[in-house]
């Protein structure tokens, strides 16, 4: 069981705390986090997960002080991930090389290391629940692959995820 845990680097503190708690519960239930090693939401999900229940995809070696020498961290993006990101990004031609690598990294967060195993669901935060920033790439990919998206910036998604989290919590008691 896997989930993608991502979102804005500017995620409000109340949601960062909630993300860490949610990650702890999901980790206890056996879910493996897929995230991207960025500050903000990514780091909150990562902090709540144990090392054996997280897989972190970084766009290049040393991103945010992380290394593929660390357990559960994978570095770099392949041509296929880059092509997939290009196909869903609305303004690819305006992205720098670094931005393109960051968007391609998002492909792994949703589809896994082999780009063939969609997460069970995606948790994120964007202001107002909008498809914005790098998170939008992951949201679009998730939706295209039938992955349910729960955006904590959308009150309806919060309510729906709360129901799912109750079910997951009951399964580990």
Regions found by a protein language model. Give the residues of each.
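Glycine-rich ThDP/TPP pyrophosphate-binding loop and its adjacent helix/strand module
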Residues: 158-173
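Acidic/glycine-enriched connector segments
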Residues: 1-4, 9-162
């Amino acid at each position: 069981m896997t989930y993608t845990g991502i979102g804005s680097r500017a995620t409000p503190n109340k949601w960062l705390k909630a993300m860490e708690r949610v990650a702890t519960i999901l980790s206890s239930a056996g879910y493996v986090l897929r995230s991207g090693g960025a500050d903000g939401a990514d780091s909150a999900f990562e902090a709540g997960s144990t090392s054996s229940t997280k897989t972190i995809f970084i766009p290049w070696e040393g991103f945010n002080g992380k290394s593929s020498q660390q357990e559960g961290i994978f570095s770099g993006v392949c041509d296929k991930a880059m092509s997939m990101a290009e196909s869903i990004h609305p303004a690819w031609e305006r992205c720098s090389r670094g931005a393109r690598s960051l968007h391609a990294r998002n492909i792994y967060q949703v589809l896994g290391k082999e780009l063939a195993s969609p997460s069970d669901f995606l948790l994120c935060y964007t202001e107002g629940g909008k498809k914005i920033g790098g998170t939008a790439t992951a949201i679009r990919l998730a939706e295209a692959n039938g992955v349910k998206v729960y955006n904590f910036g959308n009150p309806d998604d919060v309510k729906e995820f709360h129901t799912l989290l109750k079910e997951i919590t009951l399964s580990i008691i």
